[in-house]
Amino acid sequence: MGSSERSEAFGTPRESDMSSGDEAELEELRREAAMLREQLEHAVGSHGGARSARDVHQLEARIDSLAARNSKLMETLKEARQQLLALREEVDRLGQPPSGYGVLLATHEDDTVDVFTSGRKMRLTCSPNIDVSLLRKGQTVRLNEALTVVEAGTFESVGEISTLRELLADGHRALVVGHADEERIVWLAEPLVADNLPDGHPDALNDDTRPRKLRPGDSLLVDTKAGYAFERIPKAEVEDLVLEEVPDVSYEDIGGLTRQIEQIRDAVELPFLHKELYREYALRPPKGVLLYGPPGCGKTLIAKAVANSLAKKMAEVRGDDAREAKSYFLNIKGPELLNKFVGETERHIRLIFQRAREKASEGTPVIVFFDEMDSIFRTRGTGVSSDVETTVVPQLLSEIDGVEGLENVIVIGASNREDMIDPAILRPGRLDVKIKIERPDAEAAQDIFSKYLTEELPLHADDLAEFGGDRTACIKAMIEKVVERMYAEIDDNRFLEVTYANGDKEVMYFKDFNSGAMIQNVVDRAKKNAIKSVLETGQPGLRIQHLLDSIVDEFAENEDLPNTTNPDDWARISGKKGERIVYIRTLVTGKSSSASRAIDTESNLGQYL
């Protein structure tokens, strides 16, 4: 082959790919390759192909070795060049001057922008790479050393928290209150402006992407130096009070409270469903309902069932699908409202009713349910270490009696110490209807048991065989037997002996302290015993003995926790309201090995409720 072809085969590098330091070595390789070519040509020309085959083979091997060395050297040189370029870029980057940041205030038609940076407002030019039309007010922008906008960032995510007092008429500014009640006017960043623009405005968000509009009292993230509010910050203690959708509890899920359910339906549902009749008879619907009675007897369940039933009835009246019925149930636990800071509890109450009115203005029923009402709306003047009730109670009264009114809003309170609630809340015109949720008697207990012991449960084969395989009869017999055991006035069921001021004594049994929650506990214990029995014996199914054992365990567990209250409550339970209780003695000797013990009614009663 020709010399040029052989040069290409040898892979001789071009001058442009080499550095001056390696030229000597490459030149030496070229001379050596040229000498080898001459020797090869001389050998072929002088002795012929057959005679010099061995020499030709050696020369070709030598040429291949040189070509490989040349290729490796080229790769090394390329790698070194790339490293040099990377180092040069790093040096250039480290040598760049620092960038500054600012908040965009406004844009102009000549592609200049107003930016707040370093504590001053400046008009700056933009880099050609920046599309000024895409910039948004309140956005963070990056500036080079010449104070030219070179990059658009996001909106600020840290800053001070201020409270929105009101939105100004232009919709782009707001009055906020900061630390130490300092008022200031700030601009709203474009996301907040778009949230609050009216429907139909070209920049307004659609209903799917629009968050709720700003309201007085909202917390805003504010940059006080730039004068911008960037986003609404939800407060945890306020967001815990958000409106809950329709509860999934119906009246059919509640047992043993038929009379009380009828009372509350008359008080709540009739005014909503038959407004015309109420107007015709000039009858004012009640503003509120108080559910009171011992704990664990279904007060909260009834309130949730009211919201569920009301939503479905309203949907029927309007001709809507009952499955899409809507009402709102605002569940407020009294202790959640308490706050150590002066005025915070009252602010929470105002927010609760403000949100309730907003939802009710759409024609949707709203139920505001205060659980543990006695914990916050106590009788004024009874506080030992705090007088918070002196301002909280008037705040609730002003919301109920306020000039704004409570259209489509019903207030339901629940308490097991109704005697501690301020009387002003309970007078007619406020919580008009008062319904006592009593402890279940034997008939009510059977109804409650039937909600938990259903025919779908697996029953033991032996128990089923006694009733010829009739599951309904077996379940009914189970319920009757367990209720009979629970309500029997036998020695095993004795709990307390009460002594009255006139010397009379009365024995109280566990049935006097029974509740729906206790019945549910009994059934749950029995189901757990049935599961353990399956694991131990392999025989599936619930037995009557599981239920009877659960009653014994439940009574024994309550032995050390007698649900004692003040003497007036004891008199209310026993039916002797005119007699004062002076002495209480426990009669149970279950899991505790000690004998009957006395309870000092003067000091150890109130904390058990």
From Swiss-Prot:
Pathway the protein contributes to: Protein degradation; proteasomal Pup-dependent pathway
InterPro entries associated with the record: AAA+_ATPase, AAA_ATPase_domain, ATPase_AAA_core, ATPase_AAA_CS, NA-bd_OB-fold, P-loop_NTPase, Prot_ATP_ID_OB_2nd, Prot_ATP_ID_OB_N
Parts forming coiled coils: 17-96
Residue ranges crossing the lipid bilayer per the database entry: none
Keywords: ATP-binding, Chaperone, Coiled coil, Nucleotide-binding, Proteasome
Binding-site residues for ATP, renumbered to this chain: 296-301
GO biological process, one term: modification-dependent protein catabolic process
GO CC annotations on file: proteasome complex
Pfam families, alphabetized: AAA (PF00004), Prot_ATP_ID_OB_C (PF16450), Prot_ATP_ID_OB_N (PF17758)
HAMAP family: ARC_ATPase (MF_02112)
Family named by the database record: Belongs to the AAA ATPase family.
Protein name: Proteasome-associated ATPase
Record gene name: mpa
